[in-house]
Amino acid sequence: MASEEGQGKTYHYFKRAILALYSDLKKQSAVIDELFAKAFAEALKQGKLNSAVFKLYRENFGKETKNSTLIKVHKRLGVLSDSGGFIEWANNGNDGSATCFVLRDKYVLTCHHVVGHIVGEGVEEKDWALIISHSARVTFSYEDKYPKENSWFSLAPWFEISDKHLDFAVLKLEGDRSLFPAGLVQFSYPLPFNGLIYIIGHPDVQAKSADGCTVVPVFKRKRECHCHIQRDQKGVCNNVKCGPEDRQCIHMFTQRSFQHVINNPNVVTYDTSFFFGSSGSPVFNADGQLVAMHTAGYKYKKNKQLHSIVEFGFSMVAILAAIKKNYKAWYEFELPSLWEDAGSCPGEHEDFTSAYTNDIEMETLE
């Protein structure tokens, strides 16, 4: 590399002698030159300085380098992923799917709104248990092809542990306990302030997969949401760009739309490619510890493609604290390894009642 001074700045370029020795490097240099030429031309159209282009590529490259993951973490996530489940239901024309994971023994955790979709609208909660048992089933082996009939577990007519505000529900598996995957509750850990997280679930009724995401820190949530809205609301609003449904339009969101997420200490926010069907997915930190359950997000359509302003999951610490507070007998009996050490868990949580788009998949009846 050689350097050249100009207007108080230093620019680096490859010496021709070095490029002559490495033909592949010469090709890559040409690609980079072309890339920056296009970027400079676009910056000129937008009235931006060339320095803004350099800043942009520095930031993008920095983000990519920080997404690297140790192999030992990949191996750990591979083991933990065995406990992630695919839950599907068919209830009198009401079909859908979502994600869940084994909490401990025969109990699985998923979102309260998922269970709400299983039972359908207008059903009293006292009748939910029976409908869940008749309509839904769970498998942990959907990793490639759609599982065979002998790979599924039924759900017991049991619905006793749930919370609408933290959007969680505990369901009970039926069958041979020796065939259930290991529970994840003992790996629960407080939310990370920043860094990487990994979601393992079944987006879009697909086989089990993982998505690495960057945490949006609490102090950046408001800015990230507002910048996202301002950037994409500049375009014209029409059916082609925003979709035919009002709720899918970026222009429907305002600065007040995200207050309950922005100011909620019990959620972790991030940007993920997991959309429909991923509610109930376990969320792990960079060390493979269970920090949250993926819940929902604010989505919109742009140019016929689905995008998200922000996605979030509720803290496992908050979920366990709510179970301990409201269902203490069950907590102490079913989670004996935790209740003696859980005194430091926060027992209170903020109300969370804003409307949001749930990440579940509902089939369209024709």
Labelled PLM ranges:
Residues 3-4, 23, 159-162, 175, ...:
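Intrinsic disorder/low-complexity signal
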Residues 9-13, 243-252, 259-268, 273-275, ...:
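C-terminal subregion of chymotrypsin/trypsin-like serine protease catalytic domains
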Residues 11-13, 22, 57, 107, ...:
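Sequence-level detector for tyrosine residue identity
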